[in-house]
C-alpha cells in the first residue's frame, strides 16, 4: 500500500491520471475545493455530502450523503448485485428462447410435425418464462461478490462465456424436447400426448436451469443454493401448478391440445431436467477451474 500525505491538487490529479494509465478504474473521495480537479478526472468522483464544499459536490459524480465510507462499499455491493441479476435474467432467457426457436426450425426443415403447437409456445413464453424469469430480478447478493475483481472497462454484457452458455444450453433444450417427443411417438402415443410431454419437458428444463443460473460465479450444489428464496419457490410452485392444470384439467386440455401424462413418463420428464442441471453444472465447474488457472 502506498500512502501520499499533504499532496497538492496537482499531485492528486497526477495520481488519478497515473492509475488510469495503468488500466485501473479509479475512485476518488474528497471534500474541499482542492479535491475538485481529481474528483472530476476520476472514474468515480465521490464528494462528502455533510462536510463537502459545493465545488467538490459539483465536480463529483456521486455525493456521499452520510459521509460514511462504509456506504461506498455498500453501494458497490448493491451495484454488482443489480448487474449480476440483469446478467442472470439474460443468461436464463436467451437459451430458453433459442431452444424453442431451434426446435421449431429443426422440425420445419426436417419435415416433421411440430413438437410444440403455437398455443403451447405462447403459454411457455407469456406465462411460464416470464413468471420464472421475474424471480431472478430479486436474487440476493452472491457470497463472493465483493471478492471478485472489477470488470474490465468496456466489457460487454454479452461476453464470450455467455455466448457459449447460450449455444450449449440451447442445444441441450433442443435435445431434451426432441428426445422426449421422439420417445413418445416411438411408443405409439397420440401426437397430442407427445406434444404435451414435450411442452412439460421444456418447462421442467426451464425450472432446473433457473436453479443453476442463480449462482453464475460459484457452485449451485450447496444448501443455500438449493434452499433458494421465497420468490424462487413461489414462482416455481406457481408454474408447476399451472402446468398440472393445463395438462390434467379437461376444459384447458381442449384449449391447449394437451392430454394427461402417465406417472412414469412424468418421472422421465423430471429426470431430463435433473440431467440438464448435472450437465451444465459440471460444465460450469470445469470452466471456472480453467479460468482460475489461466493467469498462472
Label each PLM-derived region with a short phrase.
Residues 38-40, 57-58:
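Structural signature of FAD isoalloxazine-binding scaffolds in flavoprotein oxidoreductases
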